[in-house]
Amino acid sequence: MFSKIIQSYAKGNLIVQICIGIVLGILIGISSKEISEIANLLGILFTSALKAIAPMLVFILILTSICTKDFSQSGAKIKNIIILYIVGTFLASACAVLANFFFPVKLVLDGVQTATNSSPTHMSEIFKDLLFKIVDNPINALSSGNYLGILTWAIAGGIALKHCSNEAKQVFIDINEGVLKIVKFIVKLAPFGIFGLVANSVAQTGAQGLLSYVKLLILLVATMLFVTFVINALIVFFYTRKNPFPLIFICLRHSAFFAFFTRSSAANIPVNMALCAKLGIDKEFYGISIPLGATINMAGAAVTIAILSLTAANTVGIEISLLQAFLLSIIATFAACGASGVAGGSLLLIPLACSLFNIDYDIAMKVVAIGFIIGVIQDSVETALNSSTDVLFTAICSKNELNYNIK
């Protein structure tokens, strides 16, 4: 009987389960503060599990990605689209930073006080702080959650192991798969954690706490829509000198729609390849560019990382300098490229960006937990942006005469 319940839960729709957790959490938070405090233990366990796995995930994900990917045989078109993917992701993260400055959001978090120590603001202080984090002992970086140190050692290790044997690379691929399975297991428990977090949030902060979540979600979705209809439109016009919107709407209708519901760029690869074929793009090109885009073209993830990191800074009262904002755009860009194929990957990389502002690791993980609460909508919109942009950029880089008469 018990095993059947577990199997039924494991096979259930995670979105539906999270929605049920949110509703039950609100009801418990309103009706009983005592039960909410008990339920909060589930939230604490969930965030603790995320805190434990996140450093290892970032390290092994980036190291494996660098040491196993090979673009040396790629032609000029592939090199162009790699550049376009990275530039598009950077512009998306820069838009997210600007959106936060114009429409800052502060979260209502239980037990979070205004920061007594602001982040460094002078250029010399910023680079000194970054330098010491970068050269941190790798074991200490993993244990303390120093994500800049983790990122540095992961990149260094990936480059050093670039030319190791295929057998050695396979070991890292297998370890990476093992870590991803652990992450998927933890994320599958998200409904219980979210139930506890929502119940405690409603009991402690009332409707004000939930309202801050809604404001954050609106900012995220609005920024992603701006990237879709303004930034991507400008990129297409720059490349083609033609009206970008017919192609954008084709990509939205035939790619973003499916990606919104699958919530997986990888699962949407066959849909995107079929669309590229209908558009008249060379199979030799889109056969490489579409899977590649599902790996490194992560504009939506960059928006999520940048906005949630700056929201964490706003919440604790840290003022962000222009230099820090620029550095965040760069960090969000490359962090987003490592978020593919991981359930909640963009959320788990938020502590990496938060480390730039000396934000306490516990606070960063509370923001990550809130990300899972709003992720029911945020992750769908993020994936729709990521996946549809793969086709959009492939089309303009292909130099083929495109077929716009697609039904």
Swiss-Prot record:
Q: Which GO terms describe its molecular function?
A: neutral L-amino acid:sodium symporter activity
Family stated for the protein in its record: Belongs to the dicarboxylate/amino acid:cation symporter (DAACS) (TC 2.A.23) family.
Q: What is its main location?
A: membrane
Q: What is the lineage of its organism?
A: Bacteria, Pseudomonadati, Campylobacterota, Epsilonproteobacteria, Campylobacterales
Cysteine disulfide partners in this protein: none
The gene it comes from is sstT
Protein name as catalogued: Serine/threonine transporter SstT
What the entry lists under Pfam families is as follows: SDF
Membrane-spanning parts: 12-32, 42-62, 81-101, 141-161, 179-199, 218-238, 245-267, 288-308, 330-350
Recorded catalytic reaction(s): these are: L-serine(in) + Na(+)(in) = L-serine(out) + Na(+)(out); L-threonine(in) + Na(+)(in) = L-threonine(out) + Na(+)(out)
Q: Extract the SUPFAM superfamilies matched here.
A: Proton glutamate symport protein
Question: Which organism was this protein described from?
Answer: Campylobacter jejuni subsp. jejuni serotype O:23/36 (strain 81-176)
What cellular-component terms does GO give this entry?
plasma membrane
Membrane topology category: Multi-pass membrane protein
